[in-house]
């Protein structure tokens, strides 16, 4: 199905099932411990062996010798897999570094061996006996040190210029010129990376934890140099990903190599301390913002430049993209700079680009509003735009940023805010309020599905879409139930299997909208088949209460299956609407913090997010996404930072004892409001994504609240005690 014109009225608009706050249909499986994750397919692997990864102890250089003799002789050990005995390997298109290193070492803890044994404990013990010898090369590990060496943008991301920024900024009545930094961050998903591989002749089945089934399958086949049709990926349940499981990782490749070597199933899991250095992370940024406004507060010039680092062949953190679209302004400049760093691979983490970009932009906007003497909410409203500032002919399909800010200000009690920093106290606590705009583009990907009408009247949905804790099972079932007029309980959904039609997968906030659109497309075809089977006109038929009705005639759905189950397979492909219209999602984030006047401890007291993100397919699962994102934004603002050893090139705090994330005691009262934002330009579902929007802007709102509480402007995240303590006002 080609979606190339705005959606008209369709069966989804009935909103009998879609748009309702249904509980997650996979909830009972997860709460009873019967949902099986990648490492838990025990019945399929009664004789499984276990692999333990040995990682490089240097960040850059060469492996000069690898002695595995002692490990090989240890109890229970089967083979030790290394680059020298693994056979010829390629590299997946979406991998920056090779997943099995040697002799060249590209980053710290790049896998150099896998010890395979009868038990996990034997494999782990034997891994400590592997002796590696290296020749260490000098590496680059500090973005600040490498910044000056990077003066040109990457070839495929040139600077963007509109109007005359330099002239407009020079003559601006009010201006801000400041630098902001965000640190390297880790995904820290609850479930670690894990895989189990089984070969049957030349056919590989891999149970793994991966967000994008088709990407994983394609890159694994390429790396192993086997036909893609010989690889099957199964990933029905995923314990969080946040972008860290978008791509093929070393656990999957090494499990496949080991299983081929021992001719039996092999399980490989990355222990928590291995994940930050062995996999990917959100790269640090150094961002320079210059914004100018006229006497009335209208922005006349805006420049956002961002530096980030990555391994050779890697991509930059696109932290400037929201600054191209969020606010009006005739004169604009954005640019990315990419330094070569020898740290582990930088790649996507929840809301790549916008999340760190808004951490800087939305502080700068507050600073400029203060200089202009305008309330920060009103300043954002004053500078709203309904068109792409770089192309006045291109309008937003829907843009309710003003409504988000107005609704949020009223609900939050913004009018009671004291605009003078450091003036509100609650005992020993300084109290402040902050606001930030949220923005995330609406990305679209082709997505397919297969839908069966069974002879007993139930409906089965099959797609390789994944559920990373987001509620995919439920919203896909709601879509099929709405389209075919059956109760939600009569729909079974099967996900995460490469034998199913290729979906958009889970990433980039595109999963909900595009995967449900794929199911919609398959159901449109199935409706036609059902109508034809019972002799009805498909165009004049309605589906409700388990029946198909055409005028005065009706039939029970399962009557259409007299000749056996009916199956429809279809995909949704998006046309030029995304080029004709700018499609984005918007939010207003409001935060109250308390800062202890003596210790500098920051406590977030309450949070409010008002979101405009298309039709909300399930308010309950969508709210869960947003409050989780708000919590992640709190972590980014106040505690999360991968500490870099810039002598040896690795992340020091590579476990959850050293890398702090918010816990239940940190989470305050959280409220979420969804505006009616049904968007016929986005898809037949008229929906968009919301799981990343809930993060975008939160950290800056907290930073702005800390400033309002204390008068201390922190531009370097995270906002830790050391950045506040010696600047706090005297305790009275």
UniProtKB/Swiss-Prot annotation:
Catalytic residues as annotated in Swiss-Prot or TrEMBL: 692 (proton acceptor)
Cofactor(s), by name: Mo-molybdopterin cytosine dinucleotide
Matches recorded under Gene3D superfamilies: Aldehyde oxidase/xanthine dehydrogenase, a/b hammerhead, Aldehyde oxidase/xanthine dehydrogenase, molybdopterin binding domain
E.C. designation(s): 1.2.99.6
Reaction it catalyzes: an aldehyde + A + H2O = a carboxylate + AH2 + H(+)
Metal-binding recorded as keyword: yes
Keyword Cytoplasm attached: no
Keywords: Metal-binding, Molybdenum, Oxidoreductase, Periplasm
One GO cellular component, as annotated: periplasmic space
Subcellular location, record wording: Periplasm
MF GO annotations: carboxylate reductase activity; iron ion binding
Residues holding Mo-molybdopterin cytosine dinucleotide: 241-242, 468-470, 511-512, 615-621, 625, 688-691
NCBIfam families noted in UniProt: peri_hyde_PaoC (NF041671)
Matching PANTHER family: ALDEHYDE OXIDOREDUCTASE MOLYBDENUM-BINDING SUBUNIT PAOC (PTHR11908:SF123), XANTHINE DEHYDROGENASE (PTHR11908)
Function comment: Oxidizes aldehydes to the corresponding carboxylic acids with a preference for aromatic aldehydes. It might play a role in the detoxification of aldehydes to avoid cell damage.
Quaternary organization: Heterotrimer composed of PaoA, PaoB and PaoC.
Protein family: Belongs to the xanthine dehydrogenase family.
Stated name of the protein: Aldehyde oxidoreductase molybdenum-binding subunit PaoC
Species, as recorded: Escherichia coli O157:H7
């Amino acid at each position: 199905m080609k979606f190339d014109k705005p959606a008209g009225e369709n069966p989804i608009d009935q909103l009998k099932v879609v748009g309702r706050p249904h509980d997650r249909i996979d909830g009972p499986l997860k709460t009873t411990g019967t949902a099986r994750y990648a490492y838990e397919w025990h019945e399929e692997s009664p004789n499984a062996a276990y692999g333990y990864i040995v990682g490089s102890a240097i960040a850059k250089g060469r492996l000069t010798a690898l002695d595995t003799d002692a490990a090989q002789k240890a109890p229970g050990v089967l083979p030790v897999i290394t680059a020298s005995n693994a056979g010829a390997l390629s590299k997946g298109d979406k991998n920056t570094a090779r997943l099995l290193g040697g002799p060249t070492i590209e980053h710290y803890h790049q896998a150099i061996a896998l010890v395979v044994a009868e038990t996990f404990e034997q494999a782990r013990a034997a891994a400590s006996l592997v002796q590696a010898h290296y020749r260490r090369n000098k590496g680059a590990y500090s973005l600040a040190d490498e910044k000056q060496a990077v003066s040109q943008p990457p070839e495929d991301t040139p600077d963007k210029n509109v109007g005359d920024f330099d002239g407009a900024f020079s003559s601006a009545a009010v201006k801000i010129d400041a630098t902001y930094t965000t640190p390297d961050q880790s995904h820290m998903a609850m479930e670690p990376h894990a895989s189990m591989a089984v070969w049957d002749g030349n056919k590989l089945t891999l149970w793994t934890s991966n967000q994008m089934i088709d990407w994983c399958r394609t890159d694994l086949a390429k790396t192993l140099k086997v036909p893609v049709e010989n690889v099957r990926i199964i990933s029905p349940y995923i314990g969080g990903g946040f972008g860290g499981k978008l791509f093929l990782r070393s656990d999957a490749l090494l499990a496949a190599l080991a299983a081929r070597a021992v001719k039996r199933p092999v399980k490989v899991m990355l222990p928590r301390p291995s994940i930050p250095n062995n996999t990917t992370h959100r790269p640090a940024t150094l961002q320079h913002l210059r914004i100018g406004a006229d006497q009335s507060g209208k922005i006349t010039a805006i420049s956002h430049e961002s530096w980030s680092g990555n391994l050779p062949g890697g991509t930059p953190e696109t932290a400037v993209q929201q600054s191209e679209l969020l606010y009006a302004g005739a004169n604009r400049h954005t640019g990315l700079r990419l330094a070569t760093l020898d740290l582990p691979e930088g790649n996507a983490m929840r809301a790549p680009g916008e999340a760190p970009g808004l951490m800087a932009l939305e502080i700068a906007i507050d600073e400029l509003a203060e200089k202009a003497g305008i309330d920060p909410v009103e300043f954002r409203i004053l500078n709203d735009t309904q068109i792409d500032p770089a192309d006045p002919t291109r309008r937003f399909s829907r843009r309710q940023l003003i409504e988000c800010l107005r609704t949020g200000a009223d609900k939050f009690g913004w009018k009671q805010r004291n605009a003078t920093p450091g003036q509100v106290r609650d005992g020993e606590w300084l109290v402040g309020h902050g606001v930030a705009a949220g923005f995330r583009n609406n990305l679209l990907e082709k997505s397919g599905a297969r839908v069966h009408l069974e002879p007993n009247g139930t409906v089965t949905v099959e797609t390789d879409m994944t559920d990373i804790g987001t509620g995919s099972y439920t919203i896909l079932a709601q879509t099929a139930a709405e389209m075919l007029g059956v109760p939600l309980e009569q729909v079974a959904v099967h996900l995460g299997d490469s034998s199913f039609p290729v979906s958009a997968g889970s990433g980039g906030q595109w999963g909900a909208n595009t995967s449900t659109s794929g199911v919609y497309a398959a159901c449109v075809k199935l409706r036609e088949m059902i109508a034809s089977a019972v002799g009805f006109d498909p165009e004049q038929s309605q589906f409700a209460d388990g029946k198909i009705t055409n005028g005065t005639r009706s039939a029970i759905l399962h009557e259409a299956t007299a000749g056996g189950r009916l199956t429809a397979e279809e995909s949704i492909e998006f046309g030029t609407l995304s080029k004709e219209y700018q499609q984005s999602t918007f939010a207003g984030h409001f935060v109250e913090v308390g800062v202890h006047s003596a210790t500098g401890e920051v406590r977030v007291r309450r949070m409010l997010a008002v979101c405009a993100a298309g039709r909300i397919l399930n308010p309950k699962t969508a709210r869960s996404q947003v409050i989780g994102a708000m919590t992640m934004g709190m972590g980014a603002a106040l505690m999360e930072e991968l500490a870099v050893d810039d002598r040896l090139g690795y992340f020091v705090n590579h476990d959850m004892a050293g890398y702090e994330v918010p816990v239940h005691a940190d989470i305050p009262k959280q409220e979420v409001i969804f505006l009616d934002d049904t968007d016929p330009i986005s898809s037949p579902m008229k929906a968009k994504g919301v799981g990343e929007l809930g993060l975008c802007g939160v950290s800056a709102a907290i930073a702005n609240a800390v400033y309002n509480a204390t008068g201390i402007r922190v531009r370097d995240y995270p906002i830790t005690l050391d950045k506040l303590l010696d600047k706090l006002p005297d305790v009275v």
